[in-house]
Amino acid sequence: MENFYKVGTIVNTQGLQGEVRILPSTDFANERFSKGAVLALFDDKDNYIQDLKVKSGRLQKNFYVVKFEGFYHINDVEKYKGYVVKIAQENQEELNDGEFYYHEIIGSDVYDNDILIGQISEILQPGANDVWVVKRKGKRDLLLPYIPPVVLKVDVAQHRVDVDIMEGLDD
């Protein structure tokens, strides 16, 4: 089976017309949940269920409300709560230099002055720039803004990120 990457989790239904609420976990949510997009549905044990074609999608608060083709009633989609939607690797677009997909960054080792400080576990999108969450042993998570003075170098092939922890970031 080809490689798939998680783009969201179905967290609930929306209304009676077969729409679902999806909590996005992707860097291109508008594209992933727009009309015509094809997503793969996986159950809570990561078993492939079927491909889904987006009929409509809209942002509502922190969720995307999505209607898939062929699902017309709440009873058609209620069983998919907790399931995950993914995109096939072949459907990902090429990125420009200096751009990365979340799955390329999450799991990378983070170094400050060549000292391993942790691993990126999550990427948040609170506003102007992304924030990378670094899991550390014996310490609380470190929140790193993805800005040039902090993130010095990203080596996707080596799963390595070099950073400069500025004063005040690790208090």
From Swiss-Prot:
**UniProt GO BP:** ribosomal small subunit biogenesis; rRNA processing
* Superkingdom to which the source organism belongs: Bacteria
Q: What's said on domains?
A: The PRC barrel domain binds ribosomal protein uS19.
Keywords attached to this Swiss-Prot or TrEMBL record, sorted alphabetically, are: Chaperone, Cytoplasm, Ribosome biogenesis, rRNA processing
Q: Where is it mostly found?
A: cytoplasm
- Whether NADP counts among this entry's keywords is no
User: Quaternary form?
Assistant: Binds ribosomal protein uS19.
Fetch the InterPro entries from UniProt. Answer: PRC-brl_dom, PRC_barrel-like_sf, RimM, RimM_N, RimM_N_sf, Transl_B-barrel_sf
Q: What task does this protein carry out?
A: An accessory protein needed during the final step in the assembly of 30S ribosomal subunit, possibly for assembly of the head region. Essential for efficient processing of 16S rRNA. May be needed both before and after RbfA during the maturation of 16S rRNA. It has affinity for free ribosomal 30S subunits but not for 70S ribosomes.
Cellular compartment(s): Cytoplasm
One MF term in GO for this entry? ribosome binding
Q: Tell me the organism's taxonomic lineage.
A: Bacteria, Bacillati, Bacillota, Bacilli, Lactobacillales
Question: Residue limits of the PRC barrel domain?
Answer: 97-169
Query: So what family is this one in?
Result: Belongs to the RimM family.
Query: Can you name this protein?
Result: Ribosome maturation factor RimM
Q: Does the keyword Nuclease apply?
A: no
Kindly state one GO CC term assigned in the UniProt record. Answer: ribosome
